[in-house]
Amino acid sequence: TINSTLQCHKIKIDNGPQKEYSCSGTPADCVKLGINEILNKKPDLCVSGINHGSNASINVIYSGTMSAAIEASVEGVPAIGFSLLDYSWKANFNPFKKIIKKITLKALKEGIPKRTALNVNFPNINENEIKGIKICNQANTYWIEKFDKRTNPQGREYFWLTGAVSYTHL
Protein backbone atom coordinates (compact mmCIF):
# COMPACT_ATOMS: atom_id res chain seq x y z
CA THR A 1 0.00 0.00 0.00
CA ILE A 2 2.43 2.63 -1.19
CA ASN A 3 -0.21 4.86 -2.80
CA SER A 4 -2.31 5.57 0.29
CA THR A 5 -1.82 6.34 3.96
CA LEU A 6 -2.00 3.79 6.73
CA GLN A 7 -4.10 4.69 9.75
CA CYS A 8 -3.58 3.00 13.10
CA HIS A 9 -5.53 3.62 16.30
CA LYS A 10 -5.36 2.00 19.71
CA ILE A 11 -8.63 0.25 20.59
CA LYS A 12 -9.98 -1.95 23.37
CA ILE A 13 -12.07 -5.00 22.50
CA ASP A 14 -11.11 -7.62 25.08
CA ASN A 15 -10.14 -7.18 28.69
CA GLY A 16 -6.61 -8.25 29.38
CA PRO A 17 -3.00 -7.14 29.17
CA GLN A 18 -2.76 -7.30 25.36
CA LYS A 19 -2.35 -4.21 23.21
CA GLU A 20 -5.05 -3.88 20.55
CA TYR A 21 -5.01 -1.72 17.44
CA SER A 22 -7.19 -1.09 14.42
CA CYS A 23 -5.18 -0.45 11.26
CA SER A 24 -6.16 0.35 7.69
CA GLY A 25 -4.41 -1.29 4.75
CA THR A 26 -4.03 -4.91 3.80
CA PRO A 27 -3.48 -7.56 6.48
CA ALA A 28 0.20 -7.75 5.44
CA ASP A 29 0.46 -3.93 5.75
CA CYS A 30 -0.94 -4.13 9.28
CA VAL A 31 1.62 -6.76 10.26
CA LYS A 32 4.48 -4.70 8.76
CA LEU A 33 3.30 -1.57 10.57
CA GLY A 34 2.81 -3.39 13.87
CA ILE A 35 6.17 -5.14 13.87
CA ASN A 36 8.26 -2.25 12.56
CA GLU A 37 6.58 0.82 14.00
CA ILE A 38 3.82 0.29 16.58
CA LEU A 39 5.17 -2.40 18.90
CA ASN A 40 8.24 -1.83 21.05
CA LYS A 41 9.48 -5.39 20.42
CA LYS A 42 8.76 -8.22 18.04
CA PRO A 43 5.75 -10.28 19.12
CA ASP A 44 6.23 -13.88 20.23
CA LEU A 45 3.68 -15.05 17.66
CA CYS A 46 1.42 -13.65 14.94
CA VAL A 47 -2.04 -15.23 14.83
CA SER A 48 -4.04 -14.34 11.73
CA GLY A 49 -7.71 -15.14 11.09
CA ILE A 50 -9.91 -16.93 11.55
CA ASN A 51 -11.36 -16.25 8.13
CA HIS A 52 -14.21 -17.52 6.01
CA GLY A 53 -13.19 -20.04 3.37
CA SER A 54 -10.36 -22.43 2.70
CA ASN A 55 -6.76 -21.32 2.35
CA ALA A 56 -5.62 -24.62 0.91
CA SER A 57 -3.45 -25.07 -2.17
CA ILE A 58 -3.13 -22.09 -4.53
CA ASN A 59 -5.64 -20.10 -2.42
CA VAL A 60 -2.79 -19.25 -0.03
CA ILE A 61 -1.53 -16.58 -2.43
CA TYR A 62 -4.94 -14.84 -2.58
CA SER A 63 -5.53 -14.87 1.16
CA GLY A 64 -5.31 -11.82 3.39
CA THR A 65 -5.17 -14.15 6.40
CA MET A 66 -2.18 -16.05 5.06
CA SER A 67 -0.49 -12.94 3.65
CA ALA A 68 -0.43 -11.53 7.18
CA ALA A 69 1.03 -14.77 8.56
CA ILE A 70 3.59 -15.04 5.76
CA GLU A 71 4.61 -11.39 6.19
CA ALA A 72 5.16 -11.98 9.92
CA SER A 73 7.33 -15.02 9.18
CA VAL A 74 9.38 -12.98 6.68
CA GLU A 75 9.84 -10.38 9.45
CA GLY A 76 11.17 -13.14 11.73
CA VAL A 77 8.00 -13.63 13.78
CA PRO A 78 6.53 -17.15 14.01
CA ALA A 79 3.02 -17.14 12.55
CA ILE A 80 -0.18 -19.13 12.17
CA GLY A 81 -3.11 -18.46 9.85
CA PHE A 82 -6.48 -20.04 10.69
CA SER A 83 -9.33 -20.59 8.20
CA LEU A 84 -12.76 -22.25 8.25
CA LEU A 85 -14.21 -23.81 5.12
CA ASP A 86 -17.49 -21.92 5.44
CA TYR A 87 -18.24 -18.84 3.34
CA SER A 88 -21.42 -17.94 5.22
CA TRP A 89 -21.43 -14.73 7.26
CA LYS A 90 -23.21 -16.81 9.91
CA ALA A 91 -20.32 -19.29 10.09
CA ASN A 92 -19.87 -20.89 13.50
CA PHE A 93 -16.25 -20.52 14.60
CA ASN A 94 -16.94 -21.66 18.19
CA PRO A 95 -16.19 -25.38 17.69
CA PHE A 96 -12.60 -24.50 16.83
CA LYS A 97 -11.74 -22.17 19.74
CA LYS A 98 -10.23 -24.98 21.83
CA ILE A 99 -8.14 -26.28 18.93
CA ILE A 100 -6.92 -22.78 18.04
CA LYS A 101 -5.90 -22.24 21.67
CA LYS A 102 -4.17 -25.64 21.79
CA ILE A 103 -2.21 -25.03 18.56
CA THR A 104 -1.30 -21.48 19.60
CA LEU A 105 -0.06 -22.52 23.05
CA LYS A 106 1.92 -25.41 21.56
CA ALA A 107 3.52 -23.04 19.02
CA LEU A 108 4.48 -20.63 21.81
CA LYS A 109 5.90 -23.42 23.96
CA GLU A 110 7.70 -25.51 21.33
CA GLY A 111 8.32 -22.87 18.68
CA ILE A 112 7.86 -22.83 14.92
CA PRO A 113 10.79 -23.19 12.52
CA LYS A 114 12.33 -19.88 11.48
CA ARG A 115 10.63 -18.13 8.54
CA THR A 116 7.68 -20.53 8.72
CA ALA A 117 3.98 -19.73 8.70
CA LEU A 118 1.59 -22.50 9.64
CA ASN A 119 -1.61 -22.70 7.59
CA VAL A 120 -4.47 -24.30 9.55
CA ASN A 121 -7.72 -25.09 7.72
CA PHE A 122 -10.79 -26.35 9.54
CA PRO A 123 -13.57 -28.27 7.78
CA ASN A 124 -17.13 -27.03 8.29
CA ILE A 125 -18.20 -29.61 10.88
CA ASN A 126 -19.76 -29.71 14.34
CA GLU A 127 -17.59 -29.94 17.45
CA ASN A 128 -18.59 -33.58 18.11
CA GLU A 129 -17.36 -34.52 14.62
CA ILE A 130 -13.79 -33.31 15.23
CA LYS A 131 -11.52 -36.37 15.31
CA GLY A 132 -8.13 -34.70 15.66
CA ILE A 133 -5.48 -32.74 13.81
CA LYS A 134 -3.66 -33.88 10.69
CA ILE A 135 -0.43 -32.29 9.46
CA CYS A 136 -0.03 -32.41 5.69
CA ASN A 137 1.80 -30.78 2.80
CA GLN A 138 0.26 -27.98 0.80
CA ALA A 139 -1.90 -29.41 -2.00
CA ASN A 140 -0.93 -29.08 -5.66
CA THR A 141 -4.40 -28.27 -6.94
CA TYR A 142 -5.13 -25.09 -8.82
CA TRP A 143 -8.08 -23.15 -10.18
CA ILE A 144 -9.10 -23.49 -13.82
CA GLU A 145 -9.94 -19.87 -14.62
CA LYS A 146 -13.22 -19.05 -16.30
CA PHE A 147 -14.83 -15.62 -16.40
CA ASP A 148 -18.46 -14.97 -17.24
CA LYS A 149 -18.87 -11.60 -18.93
CA ARG A 150 -22.06 -9.90 -17.79
CA THR A 151 -23.78 -6.53 -18.07
CA ASN A 152 -25.15 -4.62 -15.08
CA PRO A 153 -28.49 -2.70 -15.15
CA GLN A 154 -26.63 0.49 -16.11
CA GLY A 155 -25.21 -1.23 -19.20
CA ARG A 156 -21.65 -1.58 -17.88
CA GLU A 157 -19.71 -4.77 -18.44
CA TYR A 158 -18.38 -6.76 -15.50
CA PHE A 159 -16.91 -10.20 -14.97
CA TRP A 160 -17.84 -12.99 -12.59
CA LEU A 161 -15.06 -15.46 -11.75
CA THR A 162 -16.32 -19.02 -12.10
CA GLY A 163 -14.34 -22.10 -13.09
CA ALA A 164 -13.41 -25.20 -11.18
CA VAL A 165 -10.68 -26.75 -9.07
CA SER A 166 -8.21 -28.99 -10.88
CA TYR A 167 -6.95 -31.94 -8.89
CA THR A 168 -4.08 -32.72 -11.27
CA HIS A 169 -0.50 -31.78 -10.48
CA LEU A 170 0.87 -28.52 -11.83
Residue ranges and their predicted role:
Residues 38-42:
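Glycine-rich phosphate-binding loop signature in dinucleotide/nucleotide-binding domains
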Residues 84-90, 108-153:
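Active-site rim beta-loop-alpha module in soluble metabolic enzymes
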Residues 54-63:
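Glycine/threonine-rich flexible loop motifs
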Residues 86-104:
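Short, glycine-/small-residue-rich phosphate/pyrophosphate-handling segment
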Residues 1-30, 34-35:
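A cross-family phosphate/adenosyl-ligand binding-site feature
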Residues 168-169:
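Conserved small/polar residues in nucleotide/adenosyl-binding loops
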